Amino acid sequence: MYIYNCIFTGKEVFSDAYPHKLEDEGFVWVVDGKYEELADQKFDDSLFGGNKSAEGEDDEGEASTEYKPVVNTLLRAFRLEEPVTITSLNDFKKALKKYTVNLMAKLNESNQSRVAVLKSKLPKYAKQWAEDFDKIRVYVTEGDGFEVEGTLVVITQDVPFGEEKPNDKCKMTVLADSLIKEKF
């Protein structure tokens, strides 16, 4: 099994346990995920101060009002966080610029030939993400939600965000040069 870690934070971004492919001549990883219902989590009135015995209610014959959350398998498995500092398109552009500058500096140290690839291919993705900003979500690795010092992870899906149901599909896109492949 291989784990793909952020080159900056060292934290997990994804693993080969999920369907994935290297696209655009090795520029981006696209990872397939889905939404699933958390069967082990139960939410009922007791979480919010409800006490059926004190209220004089009888459990018999009452319909269950349990809530089972639907979660993104990629976000859950790798503990990706939505950065609190990216709330608008302008915030996203600033974060992407900072990320790009940091990635180019890292590539200048380790693999200078990839800087030209980054400069030539990234504008296409940046333009698409900016145009579709209301249809994407940006995530970072665990613990990077405030500083946003590491890899930016873009999630897209076929259904509007907030309307997910079990088995709805999603895709993660991440720049290949911002990851380190590690055998686990």
From Swiss-Prot:
Q: In which tissues is it expressed?
A: Concentrates to the body column, with no detectable protein in the head and foot region.
Query: What cellular-component terms does GO give this entry?
Result: cytoplasm
Where, by residue number, does the polypeptide cross the bilayer?
none
Where the record annotates domain TCTP, the positions are: 1-184
Keyword NADP found: no
UniProt keyword annotations, A-Z: Calcium, Cytoplasm
Q: Which superkingdom is the protein from? A: Eukaryota
Listed GO MF terms: calcium ion binding
List the InterPro entries hit by this protein, alphabetically.
Mss4-like_sf, Mss4/transl-control_tumour, TCTP, Translation_control_tumour_CS, Translational_control_tumour_p
| Subcellular location as annotated | Cytoplasm
Is Iron-sulfur included in the keywords of this UniProt record?
A: no
Q: Name one Pfam family in it.
A: TCTP
Family per record: Belongs to the TCTP family.
Q: Function of this protein?
A: Involved in calcium binding and microtubule stabilization.
| The name this protein goes by in its record | Translationally-controlled tumor protein homolog
Q: Can you name the source organism?
A: Hydra vulgaris
